[in-house]
Regions:
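Structured, non-membrane catalytic/scaffold regions adjacent to prosthetic-group chemistry
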Residues: 2-202
């Protein structure tokens, strides 16, 4: 799937010129397209866990039951895929990354989100804090389906959606920025949709 997915020639549909919610080069999508780099992992909840590790004073790990017992938030956000579709007012429920990092002491400036299926993506730590990111477990009032990243996915709606890693299992805090899966194949290191940061050099 990676060969077909990575293409500068993807043109998408015509952008509604009067819609200020659409970043440059995007079109509004009513559905929720499924794009993945490989087969959909299906991890039983009794085997699922989530960890914060790396450049931290002490690693932290939660089982599914412990994770679901953490305070969660309902959020409504627009999302923007690098393949040029945007979906407005998507409703999620998830645990704020701020909650997962509460009490963590670190000098790290970056994070690698690692996921089932050997997927990773890299982000500045500041883009996951300050109420800007969640680990989401529900979408539109229902448990998050595996094809959309369930049982839990990272949700970083202010960046292109590949940064919201599906099937997330942990956050590794690092001193240096380490390119993730798509970033190593030519996607932009940051991925701001309003600056059209899709690929290297954008």
């Amino acid at each position: 799937m990676a060969e077909g997915f990575f293409s500068r020639g993807f043109s998408g549909r015509r952008r509604r010129a009067d819609d200020a919610r659409l970043p440059p080069g995007q079109y509004e999508e009513a559905g929720f397209p499924v794009l993945s780099a490989g087969p959909t992992p299906r991890t039983p909840l009794e085997e699922w866990d989530f960890s914060v590790l790396g450049e931290v004073d002490a690693p932290t790990r939660w089982t599914w039951e412990e994770f679901r017992a953490l305070p969660s938030e309902e959020i409504t956000k627009d999302i923007h895929c690098v393949t040029k579709w945007s979906k407005f007012a998507t409703r999620w429920e998830g645990v704020p990354v701020d909650t997962l990092l509460e009490g963590v002491e670190t000098s790290a400036g970056y994070v690698t989100a690692y996921c089932d299926g050997d997927y990773t993506t890299n982000l500045p730590l500041e883009d996951l804090t300050g109420g800007r990111a969640w680990v989401a477990f529900a979408y539109e009032g229902e448990p998050l389906a595996p094809e959309h990243g369930g049982p839990a996915r990272l949700l970083v709606p202010h960046l292109y959606f590949w940064k919201s890693g599906k099937w997330v299992r942990g956050l590794q805090l690092t001193a240096h920025d380490i390119p993730g899966f798509w970033e190593s194949l030519g996607y932009h290191g940051y991925g701001d949709p309003w600056r059209e940061q899709r690929y290297w050099g954008d």
